[in-house]
Design a protein with these regions (language model features):
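Short loop->beta-strand "edge-of-pocket" segments that line small-molecule binding or catalytic clefts
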Residues: 38-44, 140-153
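Extracytoplasmic small-molecule ligand-binding "clamshell" domains
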Residues: 27-103
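A ligand-binding cleft/hinge motif common to bilobed small-molecule-binding domains
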Residues: 105-113, 159-162, 183, 188-218
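C-terminal motif of bacterial Sec signal peptides marking the signal peptidase cleavage site
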Residues: 15-18
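Periplasmic-binding protein-like
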Residues: 123-130, 194, 198, 202-242, ...
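Short helix-initiation/N-cap motifs at beta->coil->alpha
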Residues: 29, 80-91, 135, 154-155, ...
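Ligand-binding clefts/hinges and TM-proximal coupling segments of bilobed small-molecule sensing domains
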Residues: 21-26, 157-169, 208-214, 236-262
């Protein structure tokens, strides 16, 4: 009888301990959680220049990577990146796979239904990119009867669907893939953000084969995406962004990567 009592007591202690751990985790705020972990886990693509991409040494770099580093440093946290296709980043954030997303994410009304966004740290607008010398496209709204390429899950996929009238919509994991198909003649134009298009044309070996047509459409804020009910972490991130806007870092980074300020 005594042995059975000791076994039952041990099991009860384990159960109560587990319940205590769960209760502590459930009562932690988002900021307390990352501070306890000692790191900020960031979801990003790694294939969307100039925001997030691999350099010649296969190391993550870009505008978003610098911002992630600044935020983590200001919060006294280590930094961990998790890469994946853009279409999976917001769902992954909602599922708790990372703490924030920095990957050129437009703060659209649709996305705001499932996640929150920080203050903007860049601006973006959709443009049409065509093969140089191609006729028949005057801008992103001129898509009637056209085959249009777009990055899967991007805000520009939503823009294209909103405008409508296209013959076919092809989706791609990143800008490099969509522009490769454009150059190969498989799409009439690619709908993408102006900063990403300008950077590709400037720095890619095939950039001289394509060009931007028309004016930016439907300008949006680019911001840090964060899970709902993460108010204290969101506030902390906003303070960092505001601080860097005031001390000149914001403008320096914008000029470095885009050749313009926002």
């Amino acid at each position: 009888m005594k042995k059975w009592f000791l076994v039952i007591l041990a099991v009860a202690t384990l159960v109560l301990g587990a319940c205590g751990d769960k209760q502590e985790a459930s009562t932690q705020t988002a900021l307390e959680r990352v501070e306890k972990a000692g790191k900020l886990v960031v979801g990003t693509t790694g294939n969307y220049r100039p925001f997030s991409y691999m350099d010649k040494n296969n190391k993550l770099t870009g505008y978003d990577i610098e911002w992630a580093t600044i935020i983590a440093d200001e919060l006294g946290l280590e930094l961990e990146f998790v890469t994946g296709q853009f279409s999976g980043l917001i769902p992954g954030l909602v599922a708790g796979k990372f703490d924030v997303v920095l990957s050129g994410a437009n703060a659209t009304e649709e996305r705001k239904k499932s996640v929150d966004f920080s203050e903007f740290y860049a601006k973006d607008g959709a443009v049409a990119v065509v093969k140089k010398g191609a006729a028949g496209v005057s801008g992103i709204e001129d898509m009637k009867g056209k085959i249009v390429g777009v990055n899967a899950g991007s805000a520009f996929e939503e823009v294209v669907k909103k405008i409508g009238g296209y013959k076919e919509l092809k989706t791609y994991p990143g800008a490099a893939e969509s522009f490769a198909d454009l150059i190969a003649g498989r799409v009439d134009f690619v709908a993408i953000g102006l900063p990403a298009a300008a950077e590709f044309i400037k720095n890619s070996t095939t950039g001289n084969e394509i060009e931007i047509i028309g004016q930016p459409f439907d300008e949006k804020d680019i911001a840090v995406a964060i899970a709902k009910d993460s108010d204290d972490l969101l506030e902390a991130i906003n303070k960092v962004i505001q601080k860097k806007k005031e001390d000149g870092t914001f403008d320096e980074l914008a000029m470095k990567y885009f050749g313009q300020t926002f």
